[in-house]
Amino acid sequence: MENRYAIILAAGKGTRMKSKLYKVLHPVAGKPMVEHILDQVEQTEPTEIVTIVGHGAEMIKSHLGERSQYALQAEQLGTGHAVMQAQELLGGKQGTTLVITGDTPLLTAETLKNLFDYHQGKNASATILTAHAEDPTGYGRIIRDHVGIVERIVEQKDASEEEARVQEINTGTFCFDNESLFEALAKTDTNNTQGEYYLTDIIEILKKEGKAVAAYQMADFDEAMGVNDRVALSTANKIMHRRLNEMHMRNGVTFIDPDTTYIDEGVVIGSDTVIEAGVTIKGKTVIGEDCLIGAHSEIVDSHIGNQVVVKQSVIEESVVHEGADVGPYAHLRPKADVGANVHIGNFVEVKNATIDEGTKVGHLTYVGDATLGKDINVGCGVVFVNYDGKNKHQTIVGDHAFIGSATNIVAPVTIGDHAVTAAGSTITEDVPSEDLAIARARQVNKEGYAKKLPYMKD
């Protein structure tokens, strides 16, 4: 196979996004658009990849790292000018060069591979990736002669009435013979209404030189969509989420309502797991087999074991082991580690805490900066008081302990195995194993006192 190269155009400012964030870094299904492109390009196995950067160059480099080389387009003078910036890295090399924009996140590796193969099969100097558009408004039209050979690309504003009816459009992605590409770029000029170097002018230059120009029409028009504003970004997200949901369903995951379920690129879900409506799963989350993720739950960068049930809860940067159940309305904050068969009930918050196998934290409880052993019962309304106003402190609770309802545990404290805290206690000292700790005032009943209270009178 001959050498393959790729140039990703990512220097545009993206003013129509009206955003402080660089356009190609806007996420689609949780991943920056330009990273989607790079992922797909890498699957075509190019020898070298060059990303053209301009505004926000350092942000792009920090995202893509050493996966790409970079060339700076300091002044934006058109797509042709952008490709010129790669000449120092790719000029004079033999092979085929893919030119692709960084704002087309829906393009797939399969389409790009087909484009490469078609280009090489036609022995063309240039091949345009095209698509059939039901409404081609705004796109450049592919004009072919009577036998179907590509003649030129006509932009919308320059198209005649007949040309405007053409439904085959230019997607902005091309394959070029690398040497022909840079030779033709040297012959482009800025004699147009925008005063820019157009990459599309190369097609006419190559045709005039008698070189072969081909066009490969891809099957799915959705892949052609460029993202230039928030409306297009929303559409791209919808399409990408649909693709991802369909992939998971084909892999054995049940979605109760795919249209309201939002799964990021890169999330892993095991077979026979059920995802209910309104669920959002983000980042590098891994979910095991035979789980139930209840309606309106949100899971971010977490690892969920097999046979876990999550009901209407938020889980962030946490681990939930096999057979545990969480919720409804629980919140696992970063560094929560919930053991096998643990029960985390309604309105429980866990942060930077390890809860071992079989422990039950039923309701209305805060567990922060703590290590809980096995088979503990934590009653209603328990607070692990971990913050003294300056520093966080740790609490350790041993196996088989019983923490009575409304206990305040003021860290740092260690509660031993099989120890018990009485309901309503404020624990400020260690509790030895098998001891009962009572830390509350003795009850006093004042006879007849209630009658003296003004709100108790008739």
UniProtKB/Swiss-Prot annotation:
Coiled coil location: none
Keywords: Acyltransferase, Cell shape, Cell wall biogenesis/degradation, Cytoplasm, Magnesium, Metal-binding, Multifunctional enzyme, Nucleotidyltransferase, Peptidoglycan synthesis, Repeat, Transferase
Membrane spanning residue stretches: none
EC number: 2.7.7.23, 2.3.1.157
Region spans: Linker: 231-251
Signal peptide positions (record): none
Family, per entry: In the N-terminal section; belongs to the N-acetylglucosamine-1-phosphate uridyltransferase family.
Protein known as: Bifunctional protein GlmU
Organism: Enterococcus faecalis (strain ATCC 700802 / V583)
Gene name linked to the record: glmU
